[in-house]
Amino acid sequence: MSNAQLETAIEAAWEARDTITPATMGETREAIEDTLAALDGGTLRVAEKQDSGDWHVNQWAKKAVLLGFRLKDMEMQGGSAQGGSWWDKVDSKWATWGDNEWGAAGFRAVPNCVVRKSAYIAPGVVLMPSFVNLGAYVDSGTMVDTWATVGSCAQIGKNVHLSGGVGIGGVLEPMQAGPTIIEDNCFIGARSEVVEGCIVREGSVLGMGVFIGQSTKIVDRETGDVMYGEVPSGSVVVAGSLPSKNGVNLYCAVIVKRVDERTRSKTSINELLRD
């Protein structure tokens, strides 16, 4: 099916989602499985950047990810340490892979990383022991460091560094209108969290322990401007606070400056790790 045909079939299946079971066959199953396969192979994305800089969300692709849970029963998933297993409805991305598939994929997966089927990992990515959820897209040259998590349908750009313990939020629970997006050449500091469909624009740097959701105030220190849900391109952001009332200060994220050469020298990627 073409993408237009898939979209039509997925939208129809969504309206009848309560009737979909592991016994469902025909066009509905084909459309769901083909959409998940396209997401897995990177030929389809849940969100795509337009020439204007805006992100277009393919809501139907996100619906297909959810519908996939209706098509399968729980089953044993192999591959755990010491011959152990998991109990889930979603296969590992590489459950059936051999040398040829790994060679063609072109990314590096360190022991104990987990990627679920329908997530795309581009060539040149390095996955330390980390977790990438279904429907996500991780672009080339990116490092997903130890204990970092990439949530369902999240979009991670090229040459991004997600430091240890970083959390990038998903869209499936609670349901979000759009995915969390980290654009190209961003550095996300250790233990930071970006969630609820927020966007970190190209070339930005988040310091350690920065938390950004849709209700988080993002304050530009130079101008005093307050924004929500989006970090402007080339920003350096740290954790801060603003006075509230009764002598209480509340958390905010503070844009302290724009990225300069000194910042780049501290946050540039190491090509030796990506050979």
Curated annotation (Swiss-Prot):
Cellular localization per UniProt: Cytoplasm
GO molecular function, one term: 2,3,4,5-tetrahydropyridine-2,6-dicarboxylate N-succinyltransferase activity
Main location: cytoplasm
Biological process, per Gene Ontology: diaminopimelate biosynthetic process; lysine biosynthetic process via diaminopimelate
Pathway: Amino-acid biosynthesis; L-lysine biosynthesis via DAP pathway; LL-2,6-diaminopimelate from (S)-tetrahydrodipicolinate (succinylase route): step 1/3
GO CC, alphabetical: cytoplasm
Residue positions binding substrate: 108, 145
Catalytic activity: (S)-2,3,4,5-tetrahydrodipicolinate + succinyl-CoA + H2O = (S)-2-succinylamino-6-oxoheptanedioate + CoA
Keywords in alphabetical order: Acyltransferase, Amino-acid biosynthesis, Cytoplasm, Diaminopimelate biosynthesis, Lysine biosynthesis, Repeat, Transferase
UniProt keyword annotation of Transferase present: yes
UniProt cross-references to InterPro entries, sorted A to Z: DapD_Trfase_Hexpep_rpt_fam, Hexapep, Hexapep_transf_CS, THP_succinylTrfase_dom1, THP_succinylTrfase_N_sf, Trimer_LpxA-like_sf
Recorded family membership: Belongs to the transferase hexapeptide repeat family.
HAMAP family with a match to the protein in the record: DapD
NCBIfam families with a match to the protein in the record: dapD, PRK11830.1
Oligomer and partners: Homotrimer.
Name used for this protein in its record: 2,3,4,5-tetrahydropyridine-2,6-dicarboxylate N-succinyltransferase
